[in-house]
Amino acid sequence: MTIDRARELDAADPLAHYRDRFALPADTIYLDGNSLGCLPKDTPARIAEVVAEEWGRDLIGSWNTADWIVMPQRIGGKIAPLIGAAPHEVIVCDSVSVNLFKLIAAALQMQPDRKTVLSEPGNFPTDLYMIEGLEKQGLATRRLAERDRILEALDEDVALLLLTHTHYKTGEVFDMAELTRAAHDKGVLVLWDLSHSVGAMPVDLDGCEADFAVGCGYKYLNGGPGAPAFAYVAERHHSALSQPLTGWMGHAKPFEFLDDYAPAPGTDRLLCGTPPILALAALEVGVDLIAEIGVERLFAKSQALSEFFRECLSERGISLELVSPEDPDRRGSHLSFRHENAYALSKALIARGVVGDFRDPDILRLGFAPAYLRFE
C-alpha cells in the first residue's frame, strides 16, 4: 500500500523532526515552497525581540550594540557556504531585480568593447526585463538564444551570459560548470540567478568559477514574503566592480557624509540604502535553519519526495505530462506538469487543502521543499 510505504519513508527520514521547526496549518499540504517558503517557528519571536528590545528599548544604539550595521555582511556570510562561495563574496541587499540591474551594469563596464547580454527566451521575466531596461538606456543589446543554441550564440559581441540555474517553470537545471567554462572560453562573463536553487540543492559558484550570482530569500531560505535578496561577486572581480546605484551605504566612509562617492571595498559597494533590519532578522532565522540541516541532505530528500510522488501518480493511474526532466539530478525541487486544465486543477487542489501553483498557459507546479514536507 502506498500509505504504508509513505509511513516507512517518514520513519526512516533523518530530517523528519525539522518539520516541527515550522508553523504549518494542520489542514494543508503545502507544495508551494518554491514560491514562498513556510514560516520558521523561531521567526516571530526573533522579530518581536528586534522590535521590542533592539528598536523599542535600545533605539538607534542598536546599529552598533545589536550589530544591525553588519547584518548584510553577516547573513551573506551564512548564505555563502550554501552556494559554494567565500563569506566576503556574498552580501544581502535589495531585491533580485535590483541586484540583477547592478550586476548586469557592472559586467558591461568590465567589458567595454562588448555590449550584448545573452539569455534565453522563457527565462524568468525580471531577468529579461532588467536587460531590456538597460537596452532602452542605450547601454546594452539583448540577445536571446534557445537553450540548445546558447553555446553557438557566444561570440565576440557578448559581454555577459545571464541564466537562471534552475528554471522557474520547468525545474530544469543548467550545467553551471560547463556553461561557465564555455562562456569564459569566449571571453564572456556569467551571471547566475539562483532563486530556485539556493537552499534547495548544492551549488558551487567558486568551484565552477562563476563571475556573478543573485538569489532570493523568500523561497527555500524561508525568509518571508519580500525577504531581501543576495548578490555574489567572485573575489577576482572585486577591485574592478563598479555599479550604478551608488547609495550612501555603499560608500567607503558612509558616516563621513562626503559630497563625492568612493566605493566601499568588495561586495560592500553593492549596498545602496539603509538595510531593512526587520526583514533581515527574519531572513537570518531561515538561513540559519537551512544551514543547520545542510543543502546536500535537503536535496537528497527533495529527490526522494518527488520520485515517490511520481510513483504514487503511477500507482493511482493518474497520467500527467511531466515537463521537468525525468532525471532527478537534472531538476530542482519542484515538478512541473502540463495539462490543458492546469489552472482548474490547481484551484481544485487548493480547495482540497493541497497548495501548489499554476503558470500560464498550462503548467501545474508542485514544489517539494524538503525541510518541512513529509512523505505521507
What is the meaning of each model-derived region?
Residues 1-376:
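Pyridoxal 5′-phosphate
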